[in-house]
Swiss-Prot record:
It is found in: Mitochondrion. This is Elongation factor Ts, mitochondrial. PROSITE patterns: EF_TS_2. GO terms for biological process: mitochondrial translational elongation. The lineage of its organism: Eukaryota, Fungi, Dikarya, Basidiomycota, Ustilaginomycotina. It holds the Pfam family EF_TS. One of its GO terms (molecular function) is translation elongation factor activity. Residues 1-33 form a transit peptide. It comes from Mycosarcoma maydis.
Length: 446
């Protein structure tokens, strides 16, 4: 008996002295001696490597992380974990499985999600900028600053509120709205239009994804388009995700050197006009906390069930001096933010056109005719301002800050978007089955 045990040990050692990928020979050896297969199995991935991989790629299950570490091990070191190789394997796997999942869920209806807004620059020059030497191009544009407003609004849908609150989905939304804000300046989309311009979704999907922060760059080993980033998240979360609509701020184009200047046209002298962006969102989740940048007071990145993006023009010969003094910037931002709050908080459908803005109960849906209920105290010219129409408050604000100019409108809202989640989606009776419908059907409840 002892002799047979020794012979068995010799066979086991001989089998394991070679790499485990022995082909037919190893198969023959493992059939009579099952324990030899166990001896030749590669070492399990370490818990540390699994945890690190899941941390680098949020939404990755423990089983998928283990599979990636095992499948990506090089033949030369089959027992060594490589995070870098595992990341490459995961990315390739998500591209393959994500495309299949996207096709599978394409017929579903996505009613949940968020409306996100981003302002990279609100267009308001600091006192330091105003005291410095402005570029000739900026002076000709009449915007009074070397940087114009840049921002965007986008609605991204998913199937359930659970996914809408997920951190992976939230990061996708942040990156997409950041990309939309940069889209006009990096593409040929802007053309002759200015203000808030719709961005074609099909063009956006083919556009490179521009991460919203350095930390958001992630672990991707190759550049992503917006479309491939969505497929990547679909592979992780298993729900249909789609962009319903998107719009971006297109800043005024710089005129040619021989173009008529605003000071020559009689409208306002160069540098006395600024067009500022403001945004607000209501009904957001904790997973998408509003982002701030202490070095950029005009920066906004937030989302909710309803959001607004507003463009406001300030035009006064006295504006450059006020901006150089540096005492009015915070007051102006409080006013523009108040306008964005007003647009989002009330059913605001237009700026001042009674024909297209019917009265809803006691409150008009025309911005200028509404009582300025969302006016922040920092911008209020008087204690009674919240009860006064928006148009009247804007006029009073200009006088209060010594910016009134020959009876002209110093402050004007020139463009705005107020988007509410799901308002462009067909009613439930006309829509296809959603994820919840499929769950009820699978459970025999439908």
């Amino acid at each position: 008996m002892s002799g047979s045990r020794s012979a068995l040990s010799v066979v086991r050692l001989a089998a394991c002295a070679k790499p485990c990928t022995l082909g037919s020979t190893s198969s023959v050896l493992t059939r009579p001696f099952s324990h030899s297969a166990q001896l030749c199995s590669p070492a399990k991935p370490s818990i540390k490597a699994i945890g690190e991989l899941r941390k680098l790629v949020p939404g990755t299950s423990m089983l998928k992380a283990k599979e990636a570490l095992l499948a990506s091990r090089p033949a030369s070191s089959p027992d060594t974990d490589s995070i870098a190789l595992a990341l490459e394997w995961l990315e390739a796997d998500r591209k393959k499985s994500g495309a299949k999942k996207a096709d599978k869920v394409a017929s579903r209806t996505a009613r949940e999600g968020v409306v996100a807004v981003s302002i990279l620059s609100d267009g308001l020059p600091s006192s330091i900028e105003m005291q410095g030497e402005l570029k000739d191009e900026a002076k000709r544009a009449g915007i009074g600053a070397t940087s114009a407003a840049a921002g965007a609004i986008v609605e991204i849908n998913c199937e359930t509120d659970f996914v809408a609150k997920n951190e992976v989905f939230a990061q996708l939304v942040k990156d997409v709205v950041h990309t939309v804000a940069l889209f006009p300046g990096l593409s040929a989309q802007s053309g002759a239009k200015r203000g808030l311009v719709e961005v074609p979704v099909d063009q956006l999907l083919a556009f490179p994804l521009l991460p919203s922060s350095r930390e958001a760059t992630g672990t991707s080993v190759s550049a992503k388009t917006v479309g491939s980033a969505i497929i990547d998240v679909v592979s992780r979360l298993g729900e249909k995700i789609s962009i319903a609509r998107a719009a971006a701020i297109v800043a005024p184009s710089v005129p040619s050197p021989d173009a008529t200047r605003r000071s020559e046209s009689g409208t306002a002298r160069g540098g006395s006009i600024v067009e500022l962006a403001s945004a607000f969102a209501h009904g957001g989740s904790a997973g998408f906390a509003a982002a701030k940048d202490v070095s950029n007071p005009g920066y906004v990145l937030t989302s909710g069930k309803v959001a607004s993006l507003v463009m406001t023009r300030f035009a006064s010969d006295k504006l450059p001096d006020a901006l150089q003094a540096g005492s009015i910037q915070s007051n102006i931002r409080a006013l523009t933010r108040s306008l964005a709050r007003q647009v989002a908080g009330l059913e605001t459908n237009c700026i001042d056109s009674a024909a297209t803005c019917p009265v809803d109960g006691q409150v008009s849906s025309a911005l200028y005719k509404q009582p300025f209920m969302m006016l922040l105290p920092a911008a209020a010219p008087s204690l009674e301002s919240n009860a006064q129409p928006v148009r009247q408050v804007l006029s009073t604000w200009a006088s209060h800050n010594n910016l009134d100019s020959n009876g002209n409108n110093v402050v004007e809202v020139v463009d705005m978007h107020r988007w509410e989640l799901g308002e462009t989606i067909a009613p439930p009776d006309d829509a296809g089955p959603g994820f919840a419908d499929e769950v009820r059907k699978a459970a025999g409840l439908a």
